[in-house]
């Protein structure tokens, strides 16, 4: 695990955190005192952790404007995060979802460790953590997380104010891909409620909204379509 966060001090800005803070104000009229961000990288490799740790500044961070930490959470560092946040949320990709920043980091990883041709194969997954300070009491961490991520392709780990006070920080694990099991086509019942249609879209990784699912539902309700399917032996 490698974490990177913008340095604090005069002239230093947390650009990603500022963007989130401004978006909450612009989109929801919610004033937040401060938002700090952390970029995370989960690296799976046969190369020794100690060797990777020596090159993190070359690969994962800009040491002039960023601090970096390996195999630990920045939120656990009293030096870097001396104030306890009101909420902390970590967002990462679900297993099997394309992680473009992770792919870019892997390209750099292969270049830096090109001397290890026998151990160069690696996988890198990325995530973002946001720490919120001065959060209005009316704003729940669950609602906040819902505005920060797309639950079709991303997952969120949340620490509310009580968890933060107890130093129970959100830590996301490497998104291991589930084993591929090929199954024959199955008949799906589309005569279901709107809630069940959304659940079907999410569980099947269809990435379709309710209107799109209802369009599919209406298509298969069409009598002409049902007759054409029956004519070629497909269950109506």
Residue ranges and their predicted role:
Residues 1-236:
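Core nucleic-acid recognition elements
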